[in-house]
Amino acid sequence: MNDENLANSSDVPSIPGKYLRVLALAGVAALGLALGTASAQTIVDEWANVKTPPAPELKPVTIDSKTTALLMLDFMIHNCGKRPRCIASLPAVKKFLDEARAKGMLVVYATVPKGNIADTLKEVAPTGSEPIVSSGPDKFINTDLEKILKDKGIKSVITIGTAAHGAVLFTASAAGLRGWNVIVPVDGMSSDPYTEQYTAWHLANAPVLSARVTLTRFDLVKF
């Protein structure tokens, strides 16, 4: 029997078309899996090659001192002392705090859990009449902060403090997601440079939150 006859012989089993299609699809899937495995990268793998996004815009802000509260977050000696930018920012923070008080703005202080308000840096220490709450990074959790703000008819909050990636990020986010307008002077939040950078980027770009947050500087804020 020659090759042609062999090819036409009924002794050679045929493969139904549907099975051929299944085999073809399986082959494509296997190839895709192999290529995907070879090229898959995580953000950690690509870390060194990620390009820094453009800096967010700092905007001028005019505030109503009657409906705006200044949140002074974790300006504790042990927090600020280990962050050089926090120490360097104190004169500007004090000047802004003095201006806010002079305009009759509500000022609320926050400390870390079990923190002692007496450990607040003396340059920016609270007066006897200013409310104080104590919590972790999100100062709304297990505190009266939300009630304090609502009872005073507050519509906007200014969040400053240390650390930028701790109390400022979490409290600003919590305020925005609760419906308050949030103003963040970037020269009033402190940590190390990278964490300040990603905090500013997150606040300016996060879904929902970005519509509530305005990044600014102390000198761009008008009372």
Predicted regions and their residues:
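Bacterial N-terminal signal peptides
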Residues: 23-34
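Short hydrophobic beta-strand that contains or immediately precedes a catalytic carboxylate
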Residues: 71-73
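Von Willebrand factor
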Residues: 97-115
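…and closely analogous acidic/polar surface helices at protein-protein or active-site interfaces
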Residues: 83-100
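Short acidic, Gly/Ser-rich segments with clustered Asp/Glu that frequently serve as metal-coordination loops
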Residues: 76-81
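Long, contiguous secondary-structure blocks with strong helical propensity
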Residues: 34, 38-40, 87-88
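Bacterial N-terminal signal peptides that target proteins for export
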Residues: 3-25
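Active-site-adjacent betaalpha module
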Residues: 2, 40-69, 114-223
